[in-house]
Amino acid sequence: MLMKMIADLHIHSRFSMATSKEGTPENLDFWARKKGISLIGTGDFTHPVWREELKERLVSEGNGLYRLRDEYVKEESRKFPGEGTRFVVSGEISSIYKKNGKTRKVHNVILLPSLEAADAMAQRLEKIGNIHSDGRPILGLDSHDLLEMMLDVCPEGILIPAHIWTPHFSVLGAKSGFDSVEECFEELAPYIHALETGLSSDPAMNWRISKLDRYQLVSNSDAHSPSKLGREANLLDIDCSYEGLYRAIQTGEGLEGTVEFFPEEGKYHFDGHRKCGVSLSPVEAEQLGGICPVCGKKLTMGVDHRVEQLADRAEGFVKKDGKKYESLVPLPEVISTCMGYSTASKKVQGCFEQLIQTLGTEFDILRNVPSEDIKSCAGERIAEGIENVRTGNVKRIPGYDGEYGKIELFDEN
């Protein structure tokens, strides 16, 4: 039976570097329910301690997906409607290696149909390098060889190049990536069926490169804490099983579209130099020869510029069979902008909780709940802020060189 669901497949547990200690199975389940996400990746399957925790706390549904054992479900999770969160085994590998005379740094996400397959994969990876200290292990393993290994260990596995445009750690990144997926994966490139667009690009930017036409475009949060789940996600209408997910990612059947950041909000949209506070469009950066006008050092090339380099279609090109996508701003950010307090403040958090308790999940509020209902619960300004996000009537100040961009919901002039 087909089931409409929101899926976030690339996330991290507390065992990855620079992550929240809140990243436990129970907290991930709680936040997924709160946000209205039906399916999440486990993240970090390579980490032995995390894998043992997953075996203890998750139970298999017999179809390649898992759910939290009932005794671990938090009391406050039970108030949300639906059947609870499904988990799919997932992890990310950071590959750093030399190829064709250059140092390459590429992140790849792997999805697997079972924790047993994760055991087998981890066993092989452990022979390459240290998988104990970081949930996203850094290995001197060519992406091609990683894919070859996965296909050997588990032919039903899925490898998705992660946030493909990020300057420093991605397959097409300006700093240490390649100029094509084929150059990276060589004769195994036909086994790559999907690409993760990352926070700083959206599907429309990717449509400009005809070589990417054959790939499904997926979006995930890459969340380093449970509250960041669903910053980006996939809209699915699939049989609720690993097989259904596999078909959606590998063929597009049942992949209805994605939920996106406004790409300008991503940390690497424009060219720039964070230390000097310099942010430049691709045209401006070209005029300066890619050099920072303040300190004279090389600028970090942003995603917008890198797409421009590889594009063979004009800006604004719409792919005929391109999937729909919606650009959203996380609800706490909307409330924060409307109230003038930080997202962590008691006032913003109180309003967020009130909206969730009264109107439903975060995705429902951002996407579906009528403006009038939002207005009567949280006031006119927040209702208007959400409406502006829905219609794209926002001002975008692009992020650059690791600095998040800003989305302004109101024209205050």
What are these regions (language model features)?
Residues 1-95, 100-103, 394-395, 404-409:
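An N-terminally biased module of ancient metal coordination in phosphate/nucleic-acid-related enzymes
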Residues 4, 52-193:
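Extended substrate/RNA-proximal surfaces in nucleic-acid metabolism proteins
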Residues 10, 44, 87, 110, ...:
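Divalent metal-coordination and catalytic microenvironments
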Residues 10-14, 163, 224:
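Histidine-centered divalent metal-coordination motifs
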Residues 17-20, 51-55, 169-176, 207, ...:
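Histidine/acidic-residue-rich catalytic or RNA/ligand-binding cores of hydrolases
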Residues 214-230:
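Short acidic/histidine-rich active-site segments
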Residues 256-326:
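Cys/His-rich short segments
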Residues 335, 340-413:
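Low-complexity, acidic/Ser/Thr- and charged residue-rich accessory regions of DNA metabolism proteins
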